[in-house]
């Protein structure tokens, strides 16, 4: 289970140190994601260690889940102590899911669509080439794009292709000579990473794409005996995981 880290989800979760305790209940930032998962594993470790079980269980706690991939604690563990994981038959990542099972996960990639122009004074704009204007066809492609819902092993994964940032320009009287649009693509686990890259290159044909994050999807894999027994114990229909999680790292082993 990922340990709570300071850098997780920058810009989406307000920073605060305020927390409240009410008996066994903790309220505060990170209480659900991921202190809740940590607490569940610690409780299970304490209780199941004192019992006879049919399974050999390994509990893994790691840092840096939601930051740069090269900092991932799970990736570091796989590199340095892969024997703890590579022999596993089944893995559960304790993301907050409202008590249901979410199988696999969508893949994600981030990239910049970059344009170049020619700087000029805006009073003599005809002497320049506006790099921001050159992004217009790329924005139009996004506005008309229809994301798919794709069934994979009985679960419906919703895809998404969205601009998340745009940057360009240096001053209010200068025609910009460079611009960039930051795009996020969430793709279903029916695609490999290479297939997803080929798709966005087709959507943005003619543009330079600068990829900054490439994370593969993971298929559900809920048809194994261990998975089906867990589904029966939970008693709820499994759902797809729309976001990306470290389940994808486990599925690559």
Residue ranges of model-derived segments:
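Short pre-catalytic strand/loop immediately N-terminal to key active-site residues, enriched for Gly-Thr
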Residues: 22-33, 235-240
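Metal-dependent amide/peptide-bond hydrolase catalytic core
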Residues: 7, 96, 101-104, 110-253
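Acidic/His- and Gly-rich active-site-bordering loop/insert found
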Residues: 1-29, 49-54
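Residues at secondary-structure transition points
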Residues: 21, 32-35, 126, 221
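Glycine-rich, phosphate-binding/catalytic loops in enzymes
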Residues: 12-17, 44, 76-78, 109-111
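Flexible, glycine/proline-enriched loop segments at strand-loop-helix junctions
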Residues: 28-32, 63-68, 120-129
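Acidic/histidine-rich catalytic neighborhood of metal-dependent amide-processing enzymes
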Residues: 35-106
């Amino acid at each position: 289970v990922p340990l709570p880290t300071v850098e997780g989800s920058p810009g989406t979760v307000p920073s605060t140190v305020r927390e409240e305790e009410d008996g066994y209940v903790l309220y505060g930032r990170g209480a659900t994601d991921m202190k809740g998962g940590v607490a569940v594993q610690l409780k299970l470790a304490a209780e199941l260690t004192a019992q006879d079980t049919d399974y050999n269980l390994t509990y893994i706690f790691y840092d840096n889940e939601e930051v740069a991939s090269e900092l991932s604690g799970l990736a570091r563990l796989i590199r340095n102590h892969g024997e703890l994981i590579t022999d596993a038959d089944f893995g559960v990542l304790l993301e907050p899911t409202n008590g249901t099972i979410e199988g696999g996960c969508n893949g994600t990639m981030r990239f910049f669509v970059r344009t170049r122009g020619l700087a000029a004074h805006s009073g003599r704009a005809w002497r320049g080439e506006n790099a921001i204007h050159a992004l217009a066809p790329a924005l139009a492609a996004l506005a008309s794009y229809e994301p798919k819902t794709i069934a994979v092993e009985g679960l419906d994964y919703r895809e998404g292709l969205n601009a998340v940032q745009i940057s360009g320009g240096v001053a209010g009287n200068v025609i910009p000579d460079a611009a960039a649009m930051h795009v996020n693509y969430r793709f279903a686990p029916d695609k490999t990473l290479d297939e997803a890259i080929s798709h966005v290159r087709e959507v943005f044909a003619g543009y330079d794409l600068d990829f900054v994050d490439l994370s593969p999807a993971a298929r559900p894999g809920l048809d194994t005996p261990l998975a089906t027994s867990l589904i029966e114990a939970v008693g709820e229909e499994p759902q797809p995981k729309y976001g990306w999680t470290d389940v994808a790292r486990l599925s690559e082993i």
